[in-house]
Amino acid sequence: MLRVIELNFTDLEYAGFRAWPASDQREFDGFVLRSSNGFTKRANSANAIRPLISDLKGLVNRCEEYFFDQSLPSIFRIPSFIESESLDEYLEENFYEAKDHSLVLHRKIEASDFTPCKLAVKNATDWIASYSEISGINATSQKLHLDML
């Protein structure tokens, strides 16, 4: 029997946060602030999770202070499901630029879409070695990545 699970966009955001953890994660005023020593933008950004109704100047200043204290650039990640026109305008007026737009594709997956396969289960150290080999990077430079896993 096929089971349908209803998820809202905020639940999906939190699932994404759990899938790619950050060293530090805090919430306030509709944002999830995440940092991991600059390893990826997703794990080092202010992520809007609900419509923002508070003072934008104060909110952006608090986010900027958070990243400044960690010697990181301020990156705001604003999913398309967030009503953010005023935040977008405020950030643009303060010299932020929109970069690296994401596109999420989805489709219904039928049970017959899957073929049996074997999965290799690896510990984090072995996974980093495989990732580094595939990516053509030095595995010894991946300590932060390993710490996140």
Model-derived regions, located:
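Acyl-donor-binding surface of acyltransferase catalytic domains
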Residues: 52, 56-126, 139
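A broadly tuned preference for mixed-charge, low-complexity surface segments
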Residues: 21-29, 84-87, 123-135
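Short amphipathic alpha-helix that is part of the acyltransferase structural core
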Residues: 1-14, 48, 102, 109-148
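N-terminal charged segments
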Residues: 1-69, 83, 140-142
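A short helix-loop-beta-strand connector motif used in the catalytic cores of GNAT acetyltransferases and
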Residues: 18-24, 71-72, 99-102, 149
